[in-house]
């Protein structure tokens, strides 16, 4: 989180400190994490990132958390070259991200839930919940069981 500058409203541009808030108090727009990219550029390089373990946590400075807490290696899923689909679409190269091998629940939802669960623990939350009938609920349950 040392490179997080704060939160910015996607609709009106209002800024907030990086704390437990997700909507703008003025317009109820969603808040997005703002980063100090010049500081990141001075501190980290592509070679540093590539030398780290293969999980989403190799990008820690670019994530809105302090340390990985949930213990899952979510996010480092393979890119699969789609030659025939590329030809059909008229593009030179096309790669698809295979999130069916993501951990712990084999869903693309695991990537974002790993980060959300980690941030929730950092903010002191001990109970997690979500409105879902599918993959999101499974991922939240798996991460909550490990995180708390």
How should each PLM-predicted stretch be described?
Residues 1-148:
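PLP-dependent amino-acid enzyme catalytic core
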